[in-house]
Structures are given as structure tokens and as C-alpha cells.
């Protein structure tokens, strides 16, 4: 069987891995020959999120990565965020390798947090990139630097969270690959087959680019490591 690189998929707050699989069915079909999509369930129970009802009223229970409980103290909120990051990292280490992370809405915040963790202190040898669908802001890491790993941003032009998606884009450095796809729609996955195929093509291109850079980096490191030191004769 031909190995297909895995893409980790993180659903929105108040949804579920099952709901996300339905929402991403067109994209999964477009990527099927190239990638395997893996859908992870959020760690916390949740009420239904934006846009979930009434269509997914029979698809509970619902979950999230961090809660919207305003009664939590800053310390409790920070602990939720830390737990979410640890939960996702543990899954990735157990079921990886993963080539990239796809996140919808709150799932994009979670995906951005994992990219920032990988930047800060690599926890996996995977060469990661992120795809943010109708992403919200901020990540689960306070005072985070800009994301320098490759990212793809899918923005709905009538999404009520569009400004948050734009802020997330602004916090991804232009020095790396940073691609933007806009569609006529709100806080949901694009329904157009043309837009879906465009997203699939950009994901494939970003993966190929990241792999070339990874191989080039390994080759350069091996060349440097193979050079004699000043003490060798």
C-alpha cells in the first residue's frame, strides 16, 4: 500500500470530529489520492457552536479545545489552553508522522498553537504546515511570536469572524510561505467545487515545497557535519 502523508484535522468549537468529517467531505475527496485526513475529537464537552444547529442537531455530543466559560480565572483559562496543546501533541506523537494541520474556526487557533510549539522547541521531526479555515484568534500561547512555518488561510468574505481570520493572517510572517484563498461565504467550508479543488492544489503544492526545503536542510546539515573540524589533520 502506498503511504499517504497524514493531515491532522481539528474541528471548530462546539462541533465534533464526525461533524468536521462531513464538512470536509469534498476536500477529503479532492485530497484522497495524496493525503490521509485524520480527525481528532476535542478534549472538552461543549454546547453546539456557531452554525452547528439545526443541521447537526442529531450529531452530538459536541466538544471544543478550550471552553467559553467566562467564570474561569485567568489561571484556569491558561491551564485549559496548556492542556489542549499537550493533548494534541500527545496524539501527534502517538499517531504521526503528520505533514500538516488543518483547523476550522477554534480549531485554527489550536493548529496555530501547535505550529508555534514546533517553532519554539520542535517536538516532532515532521515538517509541518498549517491550513486555517475561517480561523479565529488568538492562539493558545500568550504573547506568541509570528508564525514562520508555511500557512494557508481560507477566508469567507461574509464571515462574522473575518477580522479574526485577518489578524491570524497578519501574525504569520511573510518571510515564509503564506497563501490566502478567499471565497464568497460565511463561517463555513466553501461549497464550490472549484474553490475546493483550488484549496487541495495549494495544500499539495505547500507540502511539496516544505518537503524540498526539509531535504535541502538535511543535505546542508550533512555537508556541514561531514567537514573536518579545526583540530582534525
Swiss-Prot record:
UniProt keywords, alphabetically: Hydrolase
EC number of the protein: 3.1.2.-
Top-level EC class as recorded in UniProt: hydrolase
InterPro entries on file: AB_hydrolase_fold, FSH-like_dom, LovG
Lineage top rank: taxon: Eukaryota
Residue runs in coiled coils: none
GO biological process: secondary metabolite biosynthetic process
Residues annotated as the enzyme's active site: 105 (charge relay system), 159 (charge relay system), 187 (charge relay system)
Gene Ontology molecular function terms on file: hydrolase activity
GO cellular component, one term: nucleus
Matches recorded under Pfam families: FSH1
PANTHER family: ESTERASE DBAE-RELATED, ESTERASE OVCA2
Family per similarity comment: Belongs to the LovG family.
Job of this protein: Esterase; part of the gene cluster that mediates the biosynthesis of the mycotoxin fusarin C. Within the cluster, FUS1, FUS2, FUS8 and FUS9 are sufficient for fusarin production. The other FUS cluster members are not essential for fusarin C biosynthesis.
Protein name, UniProt field: Esterase FUS5
Organism expressing this protein natively: Gibberella moniliformis (strain M3125 / FGSC 7600) (Maize ear and stalk rot fungus)
Organism classification: Eukaryota, Fungi, Dikarya, Ascomycota, Pezizomycotina
Amino acid at each position: 500500500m502506498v503511504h499517504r502523508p497524514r493531515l491532522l484535522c481539528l474541528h471548530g468549537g462546539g462541533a465534533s470530529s464526525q461533524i468536521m468529517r462531513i464538512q470536509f467531505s469534498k476536500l477529503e475527496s479532492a485530497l484522497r489520492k495524496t493525503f490521509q485526513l485524520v480527525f481528532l475529537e476535542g478534549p472538552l464537552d461543549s454546547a453546539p457552536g456557531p452554525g452547528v444547529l439545526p443541521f447537526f442537531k442529531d450529531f452530538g455530543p459536541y466538544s471544543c479545545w478550550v471552553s467559553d466559560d467566562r467564570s474561569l480565572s485567568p489561571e484556569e483559562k491558561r491551564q485549559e489552553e496548556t492542556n489542549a496543546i499537550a493533548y494534541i501533541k500527545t496524539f501527534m506523537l502517538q499517531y504521526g508522522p503528520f505533514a500538516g494541520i488543518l483547523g476550522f474556526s477554534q480549531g485554527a487557533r489550536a493548529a496555530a498553537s501547535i505550529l508555534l510549539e514546533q517553532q519554539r522547541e520542535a517536538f516532532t521531526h515532521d515538517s509541518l504546515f498549517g491550513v486555517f479555515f475561517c480561523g479565529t484568534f488568538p492562539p493558545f500561547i500568550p504573547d506568541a511570536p509570528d508564525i514562520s512555518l508555511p500557512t494557508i488561510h481560507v477566508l469567507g468574505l461574509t464571515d462574522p469572524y473575518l477580522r479574526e481570520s485577518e489578524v491570524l493572517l497578519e501574525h504569520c510572517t511573510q518571510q515564509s510561505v503564506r497563501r490566502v484563498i478567499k471565497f464568497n461565504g460565511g463561517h463555513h467550508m466553501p461549497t464550490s467545487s472549484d474553490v475546493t479543488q483550488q484549496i487541495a492544489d495549494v495544500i499539495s503544492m505547500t507540502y511539496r515545497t516544505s518537503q524540498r526545503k526539509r531535504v535541502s536542510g538535511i543535505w546542508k546539515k550533512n555537508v556541514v557535519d561531514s567537514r573536518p573540524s579545526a583540530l582534525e589533520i
